[in-house]
């Protein structure tokens, strides 16, 4: 097995904040107690996920044969993971809801996990993926979990759908989306601008979801690169090639294994270009225009502003603007969370083609 250090737990949560992320899904490994303590301290919302995934899906060939989700023999294994998670972490205020399975087909063992969680913790919702596999059976989720919708928020997955980031009569969470380009090495070499385009797509998706009724949020897959070193070549490392959507499967042999370099930071926690694209897209303060077409020299500028904080009025932050090399500070207007208003820039000798730089901090 492998684990993190206290230093990495702290650094990871701090990097979440620096990138303007406020939500993390602990897929698919149990987090450390330290990590959740930092989430409590810094105000990160957490979806805590049991270590059960890929049951009866296309990855089944890599696991024991049979449909374990309906097998009484496997019930203790399902419940042990679920019970351990809830009993260990239920006192953390950062945890908003429990996930009882990832990208799996419904069965009675997932039903028993739902029943146990609902009897044990009546304060939190439960989520399950794939929800469409439940069909008309007894529900095992309060929130619709959808993975990898298009940029407009549309997806049909196992007969459950979203349109414009909205579920059908149920809140929708896209708790796996916006996978960075990492598998198509040849294409990335030909056109590195694909990574720049990824930044435009995440900004478009987040802006669309933020205003969608019932659209709760999204979780980028993933935060950190999934690559790690083994002390020596081990029997079975070829298993990783089963998941490698790459033109060079030989890269998955030997000491270096993992699913791929899919993070917005690398394994040393160095920020990649995707980190800065995320920071920009998830900015909690959004100027609704980047160009002022109509203005009068010597008059104030009125700029539309969107407060995308969940709990913070904009008058709690500071504003600094620079025009013609002169930097000035400005008190922020009072705009309630999730509301729009106006930013008033005092009169200047405005001229066409000049740059006005505004910093919110």
Predicted regions and their residues:
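Alpha-helix N-cap/helix-start motif at coil-to-helix transitions, marked by capping-box chemistry
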Residues: 7, 76, 269-272
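Substrate-binding/catalytic cleft of secreted carbohydrate-active enzymes
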Residues: 10-15, 19, 23-264
């Amino acid at each position: 097995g492998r684990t993190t250090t206290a230093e990495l737990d702290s650094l990871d949560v701090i990097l979440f904040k620096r990138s303007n992320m406020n939500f993390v899904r602990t897929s698919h490994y149990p987090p450390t107690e330290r990590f959740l303590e930092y989430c409590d301290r810094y105000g990160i919302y957490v979806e805590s996920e049991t270590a059960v995934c890929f049951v009866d899906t296309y990855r089944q060939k890599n696991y024991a044969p049979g449909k374990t989700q309906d097998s009484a023999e496997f019930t203790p294994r399902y419940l042990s993971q679920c019970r351990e998670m809830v009993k260990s972490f239920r006192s953390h205020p950062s945890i908003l809801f429990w996930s009882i399975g990832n990208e799996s087909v419904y069965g009675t063992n997932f039903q028993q996990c739902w029943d146990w969680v609902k009897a044990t913790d009546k304060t939190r919702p439960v989520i399950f993926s794939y929800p469409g596999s439940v069909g008309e059976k007894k529900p095992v989720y309060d929130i619709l979990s959808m993975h990898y919708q298009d940029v407009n928020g549309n997806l049909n997955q196992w007969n459950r759908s979203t349109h414009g980031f909205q579920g059908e009569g149920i809140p929708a969470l896209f708790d796996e989306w916006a996978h960075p380009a990492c598998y198509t090495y040849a294409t990335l070499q030909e056109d590195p601008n694909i990574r720049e385009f990824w930044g435009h797509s995440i900004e478009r998706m987040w802006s669309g979801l933020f205003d969608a009724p019932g659209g709760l949020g999204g979780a980028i897959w993933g935060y950190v690169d999934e690559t790690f070193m083994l002390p020596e070549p081990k029997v079975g490392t070829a298993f990783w090639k089963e998941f490698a959507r790459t033109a060079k499967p030989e890269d998955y042999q030997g000491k270096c294994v993992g699913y791929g370099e899919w993070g917005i930071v690398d394994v040393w926690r160095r920020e990649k270009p995707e980190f800065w694209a995320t920071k920009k897209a998830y900015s909690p303060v959004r100027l609704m225009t980047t160009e002022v077409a109509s203005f009068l020299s010597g008059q104030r500028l009125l700029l539309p502003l969107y407060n995308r904080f969940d709990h913070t009025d904009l008058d709690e932050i500071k504003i600094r603007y620079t025009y013609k090399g002169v930097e000035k500070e400005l008190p922020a207007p009072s705009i309630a969370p999730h509301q729009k208003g106006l930013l008033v820039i005092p009169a200047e000798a405005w001229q066409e083609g000049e740059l006005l730089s505004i910093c919110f901090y």
